[in-house]
Each structure stands twice: as structure tokens, then as C-alpha cells.
Amino acid sequence: MNNSPQRAAKGFTRAFWVSNTVELFERMAYYAVFIVLTIYLSSILGFNDFEASMISGLFSGGLYLLPIFSGAYADKIGFRKSMIIAFSLLSIGYLGLGVLPTLLEAAGLVSYGVTTQFNGLPDSYTRWIIVPVLFVLMVGGSFIKSIISASVAKETTEATRARGYSIFYMMVNVGAFTGKTIIDPLRNVIGEQAYIYINYFSGAMTIVALLAVILLYKSTHT
């Protein structure tokens, strides 16, 4: 007898499909931004190459370190609450990456267009506001790394697990490929401003994922 809340196509639960769908959105959001993060830091915020590489490297390292702690916390509060926390933080972080340049431009430190014109931003400490914004993204992303694959494991049986993980990794790859391909056509149309607006795309993806979890994710395993 199946004790899952609702079995979907081919023996998978609704929670399984929701987990995989939000993973698709999260990967699209992540790769759309991460692939140009170093360029964003240098071309939009005025960091030199060393500073931009250092910040980007610390961000990447944190994404692999923090799941040790966030994964343990996720076990205590359950997958659904963890995903809500994760996508809330990711939405705040991505939108923060988009809003920050607007605030810097309003302060007269930079002018954005097809190319970026700095008016003192490289010498201003204000640009370092990016660090807490990236930290929010890092924490949100660390939850995702630990909970989505675990949710897939919980929502499959021995008979469906191999097929379930095949679907999961397909979603990861499709999301990564799609996210990486968005920036070039956007940059061809609006120039360096693309590095700003891509963050709103990623924010929209994580907001959709957040709503999907809130409205659709129900599981007896968490």
C-alpha cells in the first residue's frame, strides 16, 4: 500500500516532481548568474581582477562548505521548511544583486549603459555591500545542495530510484545548460547592463520555485 500523499506518473509522488522542477529552476538561476559573476564584480561593481576572483572563489568555496551545517539543520526542520528557507534566501540574494547597482548609480558612483562608466565606485567602500548579499545567496544555495537530492531519495523506492535519479540529473543538466545560454543574447541587445538584469531573471526563477514549494510540495517523509 502506498503511503505517499499522491502518486504521479510512473509511480513517482507529487513531491518528487516538485523537487525536480524546483531543482530545474534553481540550476537555471544559479548558472545564469555564476557564469558571469566575476565579470559582474569587475565590470559592474568596479573590483579589480584579483578582488573579483577572490570574492568569486570564496563564494564557490562556501557553497561546498556550508552544506555540512545546513544539511544537519535541514534534517531537523524537514525538507519543505528547508526549501522555503532556501528559495526565500536565494530570491533575496538574486534580487539584491540586481538592485545594488541601481542604488550605486543613484548615489552617482557609476553610470550603466551599453558600457559602464565609473565615477568613483572603484575607490568606494560601498561596493563591498556585495559581500553580505553573496553570503545570503551562499546560505540559500547550501541548503539546496543538501536537500533536493535527499528529497529525491526519500520520494523513490528501490524499484524507481535509478529512474528517479536519472530524471534528477537530467533536470540539473537542462537547468545548467539553459542558464548558461541566456546571458549572450541578452548582452548582445543591452551590453554590460545584461550583467545586472540577469539577476532579475534568476530572482524570478527562485520566486517561482518558492511558490511551487509552498503551494504544491507535500510529503509524508518530512
Model-predicted regions and their roles:
Residues 88-125:
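C-terminal ends and interior cores of transmembrane alpha-helices
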Residues 35-51, 188:
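Short amphipathic helix-loop junctions that connect adjacent transmembrane helices
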Residues 1-14, 158-162, 183-222:
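Intracellular loop-helix junctions on the cytosolic face of multi-pass helical membrane proteins
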Residues 69, 99, 174-189:
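A gly/Pro-rich, aromatic-decorated transmembrane alpha-helix motif that marks the paired
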Residues 143-157:
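Intracellular juxtamembrane helix-capping segments at the cytosolic ends
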Residues 49-50, 158-168:
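Loop-to-transmembrane helix entry/capping segments in MFS-fold secondary transporters
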Residues 57-72:
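Central cavity-lining transmembrane alpha-helices of secondary-active solute carriers
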